[in-house]
Amino acid sequence: YEKLTKLMPNVRTFNSDAPRMPFMEGETYLGLAWNGEVIMAQDQGMPELDFVYPKEGAIMWMDNMVIPKNAKNNDNAHKFIDFILRPKYAAMISEEIGYGSPNEAAKKEMPPELANNPIVYPPADLLKHAMFREDVGDEIMALYQQYWDRLKVDM
C-alpha cells in the first residue's frame, strides 16, 4: 500500500469500463487497459496506441458463458453458445470487439491482421509469465477494498 501511495501523484484517472478513453482523449499516455480496448482504440482512430506485456508477467483474464442450472430455455441457451462458437461467427465477434476467440478454427476465418495480431493473441513465451488472479477469499478481498477506497480518497 505504501508503494502505491507514492505512485498516486502520477495517477490521472481510473477507468475500467472503457480504459481506451483516457488515451483517446489525451488525458494519459501510459496506463492499464485490456487488450481488446487497445484494438478498439486503434480501430477508432488511434492506431499509434500500443499494448505492452511486462516481461515480469501479466494478468490474464477470460470471459465465460454459463447457464444456471435452473435456467429456463436451457436447450436454447446451449444452441446459442454452440452458434456463437461456430468458427464463422466467433471470428465475426472477435473482429467486432477486438478480443480473441477460444475457438482456434475461428482464427482461419479472421482477417490476417487480426488472427496474427500479438495484442489479440499473445505469443506463448509471453503467456508463460502471465497468471490468472486467484480467489483470495472474503477477508482479504475486504482488506483490498479498504486500501483501494483509501487510495481513491487520498488521490
Q: Predicted regions span which residues?
A:
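Short amphipathic alpha-helical segments
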Residues: 63-65
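Mature extracytoplasmic/periplasmic domains
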Residues: 68-128
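Short, solvent-exposed loop/beta-turn-alpha elements that line the ligand-binding surface or hinge
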Residues: 1-6, 115-116, 132-134
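Ligand-binding pocket segment of bilobal, Venus flytrap-like solute-binding proteins
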Residues: 1-54
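Non-transmembrane alpha-helical segments in soluble domains
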Residues: 1, 5, 20, 24, ...
